[in-house]
Amino acid sequence: MRGHAPDSDQQRAFIRRLPKAELHLHLEGAVTPETLVELSRRHDGTPLSLEGARAIYDYTDFTGFLMAFKAVTERLRTAEDYELITYRMLGRLAAQGVVHAEIYVSVGVVYYWGRSEFEPLFAGMERGRMRAEADFGITAYWIFDAVRHFGTDAAAKVFRKAAEMRRDHTSIIGIGIGGDERHTGAAPFRELYAEARDAGLHLTAHAGESVGPEGIWGALNIGAERIGHALTAIHDSELMAILAERQIPIEVCVSSNVRTGCCMHLADHPVRRFFESGLMITLNSDDPAMFLSDLEDEYWLANNEFGFSEEHLRELAANSIEASFLPAERKIDLLRQIEETF
């Protein structure tokens, strides 16, 4: 992190005071190298050193990122592991002024590793979530994420598990598809999304991250209520107009897009053009431990690199609350708090 001048420190303090939601965050991608070492000591015959763990997070493209994500998930094996990473993640979020988070958990990857029972692992996540709410005042919802390139049968298992478990766990709020969209578009998941919607689940989708605007059109066509990334929408004026007209929330992840090489240069990121075009954007960290940028940093980038004023940042924070799946009463209270933040 760069050194800060006094006015920079004041701006960061404002960002921390600003109540905001994190809407595009992967539980597994929030595992720091230090915690990965701790997990490795629990499960590996030859544990990782801190240097070795940091090397896993050192990559140059989207494929390298997927391999780093794999290295973390293969060391998440017990309820205690999931409780640990959930509690630590939410504690770090609360320290940045995050009041609510909607967190992707890669249930599809859990099944990929052959762990047939997800419920015991989820029990650990819930313990971590409830401890964090009691200790830090932050709330959280879960979004069960399927891996698109594992296919529709694998996704069906994830989405139906979300519907089944939601009957007893209202913290399970929605479903999504992540993974490598270069291999599989959204269209094959249309019927599964309709089934999930009918089960009372909200619908999200990663789209337009590593492919063109057609990926975003596909996500809209299967009913996604929020779009993760949507980076390439900037190349399709008709799509930009539709997104602005419908006010479909876009979960923008600036540092993520640059670090994975999906956007080659920070200055080229369309976040400012999205905002000026009237899109309903929110700022998010995606995988903060892997991209070395938390939500506070993303707001700082918006201010320092893209010229977003304090009033703009307040608008982005309000967008994050409005785009969340929180009940209306809580949204109204948090929006009031944002207006009162100076």
Regions found by a protein language model. Name each.
Residues 203-205:
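Conserved hydrophobic beta-strand within the GNAT/NAT acetyltransferase core sheet
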Residues 1-201, 210-215, 221, 225-226, ...:
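Metal-cofactor-binding active-site regions of metalloenzymes
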